[in-house]
UniProtKB/Swiss-Prot annotation:
It catalyses: phosphate(out) + ATP + H2O = ADP + 2 phosphate(in) + H(+). SUPFAM superfamilies: P-loop containing nucleoside triphosphate hydrolases (SSF52540). Its EC number is 7.3.2.1. Pfam families: ABC_tran. It is found in: Cell inner membrane. This is Phosphate import ATP-binding protein PstB.
Length: 271
């Protein structure tokens, strides 16, 4: 009996380890800009500690969906979102949700590097200061150093912390923006074409960083580069004309997709 019980426990543990853990769940998500409908009943679950790439031709709705995940669409006049999106168990569109806190939990890195017109140090310290994450300057110094290390930037800027963040190269600025997002201890990091304005060397550094960040964060990235999606993601979702066409393991999406539209897009037959 004991042996059977132990075997049952081991089987249960194995099953638990193999269970999929979803960090964010989107159910029947539609987005309207005034009378124009941009997304149609999207159902997409984002796996925890996984890089999920959103691909599709321009105007397909991938960036629109990305912005629903931390309510960035709230900043657009006339934008309306229906359906339900949860972060863990929290409905992020519930009226009781603190949007500032939500955007700390779900950070965003934009297409064009947008450092604040402040010192490198203050770029990182700004968010933790607002959210009360540091009790004193020593705490803040540690957060700044840790965040810059996470973004692979510390060794390049540790002697220049009081210089302006806008004086960095484009690739360094983007990593500074990633460090700024990391500084408030997010659970999810959204990236909207983070490498489109960067040269190949800077792009390689950001992609390497994405691989490292996946250990501690859930990442959703919009990219127009099929090669980048294949390199950095474990899951890929294909959008077309406001619809989610399919979502699957990246390897399968690029070798044997279920939908012909995905195959055509990946092969460059439309875009």
């Amino acid at each position: 009996m004991n042996m059977l019980s132990e075997a049952a426990v081991e089987k249960a543990l194995d099953k638990k380890m193999n269970e999929v853990s979803y960090k964010m769940i989107g159910k029947d998500v539609s987005v309207y800009y005034g009378e124009k409908r941009a997304l149609y009943d999207v159902n997409l679950n984002v796996r925890e500690n996984t890089v999920t790439a959103l691909i599709g031709p321009s105007g397909c709705g991938k960036s629109t969906f990305l912005r629903t995940l931390n309510r960035m669409n709230d900043t657009i006049d006339g934008c309306r979102v229906t359906g339900k999106i949860t972060l863990d168990t929290d409905d992020i569109y519930d009226q009781q949700i603190d949007v500032v806190e939500l955007r700390a939990r779900v950070g965003m890195v934009f297409q064009k590097p947008n450092p604040f017109p402040k010192t490198i140090y203050e770029n990182i310290a700004y968010g933790p200061r607002i959210h009360g994450l540091a009790r004193n300057k020593a705490d803040m110094d540690q957060i700044v150093e840790h965040s810059l290390q996470k973004a692979g930037l510390w060794n390049e800027v540790k002697d220049r912390l009081l210089e302006s963040g806008t004086g960095l190269s484009g690739g360094q600025q983007q990593r500074l923006c990633i460090a700024r997002a990391v500084a408030v201890s997010p659970e999810v990091i959204l990236m909207d074409e983070p490498c489109s304005a960067l040269d190949p060397i800077a792009t390689a550094k950001v992609e390497e960083l994405i691989h490292e960040l996946r250990t501690n964060y859930t990442i959703v990235i919009v990219t127009h580069s099929m090669q980048q999606a294949a390199r950095v993601s474990q899951r890929t979702a294909m959008f077309h004309l406001g619809h989610l066409v399919e979502e699957n393991e990246t390897d399968k999406m690029f070798t044997n997709p279920d939908d012909q539209r995905t195959q055509d897009y990946i092969m460059g037959r439309f875009g």
